[in-house]
Amino acid sequence: TNSIVYASIDSWGPQAEWIRHGLNNDQFERNIEKLLSSGVKVGIMVTFCLLSIPNFHALITFVLKMKKKYPWMLTIDTPMMSDPKHLSALILDDIMLDNLQDLVYYVQTNTSDTDICMFNSGELTKFERVYDWCKTSRFTGEELKRNRIDFVNFIDEHDRRRNTNWHTAFPELEYFYKECKQ
């Protein structure tokens, strides 16, 4: 078949479910596998933002597993979220930048243009672009402070309106939330 289905997800597990309200990650995983096993190609679209970083390894591990099981059938694209600024990865701190560098290394070590069960160089280049953008374009000064305050306000308001709990979904970012709140 010549069909291709594009599916959007920005992280994995409870974090992906918090980001995309109404998402059931287990159902998403089953649906991707069902499409692939039926011969339908899938393109995973990640709008890469700050909240993608903590559990992104789990997402790319899933993608790699599916690439190995269904060669030629799955691609991943990682365009960067630039707006709203308070959710962009440009508000990250040094710890998250280091984590992002580790993620790039993981993708690099699992990239080959001769092994169809790995990431390809185009996918790697797009992800390296995310890291380079974060490293060279991070917000500073008042812009950083304002966007981090807006980040906290967004989290609090999102949880209030949707009856969700960001703190449960993102325990590894609790320190960052507290930093931003000061």
Language-model region placement:
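Helix N-terminus capping/helix-initiation residues
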Residues: 24, 88, 92-93, 155, ...
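Context-gated lysine
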Residues: 34, 41, 65-69, 85, ...
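Charged, low-complexity, helix-prone segments enriched in Lys/Glu/Asp/Gln
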Residues: 6-8, 45, 96-107, 182
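Radical SAM/AdoMet-radical enzyme domain recognition
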Residues: 1-83
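Flexible glycine/acidic-rich beta-alpha junction loops that bind and position SAM and/or redox cofactors
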Residues: 48-54, 70-103, 113, 117-133
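Sequence-level detector for tyrosine residue identity
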Residues: 6, 12, 70, 105-106, ...
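Radical SAM enzyme core and accessory elements
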Residues: 108-182
